[in-house]
């Protein structure tokens, strides 16, 4: 299963990407694989990614872990604007 995620950032994509990359091993342990991650060409505060995931439940559980909530906050993710769309294969 794949998921599309779009979210607004407060501090730009470079700052966000450093923190995102630091969590790669935790994502791998959860069975989450990043396919593509990029910001918009004209807006470095708008991030998009597509990930391969075991299920929506796994992603939701991963994102609600306190340590990941803190990481997203530190990365400048605006939680209220996040879009998560499951994709058909």
Predicted segments with their positions:
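Short S/T/G/P-rich N-terminal loop/turn motif that feeds into the first structured element of a domain
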Residues: 1-69, 78-89
């Amino acid at each position: 299963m794949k998921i599309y995620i779009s979210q607004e950032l407060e501090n730009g994509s470079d700052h966000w990407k450093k923190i995102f990359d630091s969590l790669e091993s935790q994502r791998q342990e959860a069975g989450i694989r990043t396919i593509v991650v990029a910001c918009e060409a004209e807006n470095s505060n708008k991030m998009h990614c597509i990930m391969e995931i075991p299920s929506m439940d796994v992603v939701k559980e991963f994102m609600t872990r306190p340590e990941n909530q803190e990481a997203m906050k530190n990365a400048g993710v605006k939680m209220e604007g996040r879009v998560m769309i499951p994709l058909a294969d």
